[in-house]
């Protein structure tokens, strides 16, 4: 069955930076998906996206509110809390100053994601409230976002067919794509659940490609960290993992994460950027994209 694209999934936004006009590819579905994980409230756009791809509708859930920049992931057995690294686009906001310069304002969460490798004694299991949906629909949505990115930007149009790179080659050299880096880091943080996205094969830690061309053409290898987590956790337990923390209540009554073991997989130190690897593809001089190996007919 041919892949049917979701209309206007990606849009180009332009803004001024250091006296120059910068283009950025945005994905509102990904933005809304992050909002859902933080708040427990699905949006109309997510409902439309799920209906378009015949997925289960995301259900509202009660999100645990933390003082720190964290959000929960609905899982079958427990709430999983994702504590992002400072530079992963999830723990801060972009602000535009009077000159039009766009700056990422980071929050400080280094105390939350300490590097201690010992087990947390007396950790508290944070249970979910009425959440039985699990991560399946969330992961499917993430994968469809990546698949459509591949379709629109030069990887494949359908199984067994080969696509050509877009004529607007200039886009690859000038358009930044931070949402893909954000999505890749997020998937890495979930790697201990053995729920890695099929459309993400590898993650890259030796630099940060900032344009679509850099993301698409770069050859990358799996991180040793990914191999570590893949071996450590049993796929049979992929969606019944429980998270353990030491928590306290702040003066305002909010839940605060006090300690967390980095050995349980939730604390995943991503100090450098992650990039998406397009499977087996190399872009040639004429814009032709190599085939996808086993998918070819």
Curated annotation (Swiss-Prot):
Name the record gives this protein: Non-structural protein VP10
Organism whose genome encodes this protein: Rice ragged stunt virus (isolate Thailand) (RRSV)
């Amino acid at each position: 069955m041919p892949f049917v694209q979701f209309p206007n999934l990606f849009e180009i936004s332009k803004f001024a930076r250091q006296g120059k006009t910068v283009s950025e590819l945005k994905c509102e579905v990904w933005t809304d998906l992050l909002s859902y994980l933080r708040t427990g409230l699905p949006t109309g756009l997510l409902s439309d996206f799920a209906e378009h791809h015949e997925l289960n509708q995301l259900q509202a859930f009660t999100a645990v509110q933390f003082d720190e920049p964290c959000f929960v992931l609905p899982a079958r057995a427990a709430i999983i809390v994702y504590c992002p690294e400072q530079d992963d686009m999830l723990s801060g906001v972009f602000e535009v100053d009077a000159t039009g310069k766009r700056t990422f304002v980071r929050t400080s969460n280094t105390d939350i994601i300490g590097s201690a490798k010992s087990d947390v004694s007396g950790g508290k299991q944070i249970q979910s409230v009425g959440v039985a949906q699990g991560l399946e629909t969330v992961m499917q949505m993430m994968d469809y976002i990546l698949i459509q990115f591949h379709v629109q930007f030069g990887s494949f149009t359908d199984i067994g067919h080969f696509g050509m790179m877009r004529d607007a080659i200039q886009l690859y050299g000038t358009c930044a794509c931070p949402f893909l880096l954000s999505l890749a880091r997020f998937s890495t943080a979930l790697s201990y659940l053995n729920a890695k996205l099929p459309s993400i094969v590898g993650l890259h830690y030796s630099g940060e490609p900032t344009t679509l061309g850099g993301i698409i053409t770069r050859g990358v290898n799996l991180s040793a960290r990914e191999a570590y987590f893949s071996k450590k956790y049993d796929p049979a337990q992929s969606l019944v993992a429980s998270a353990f923390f030491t928590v306290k209540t702040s003066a305002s009554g909010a839940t605060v994460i006090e300690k967390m073991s980095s050995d349980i997989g939730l604390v995943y130190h991503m100090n450098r950027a992650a990039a998406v690897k397009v499977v087996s593809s190399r872009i040639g001089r004429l814009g032709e994209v190599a085939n996808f190996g086993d998918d070819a007919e």
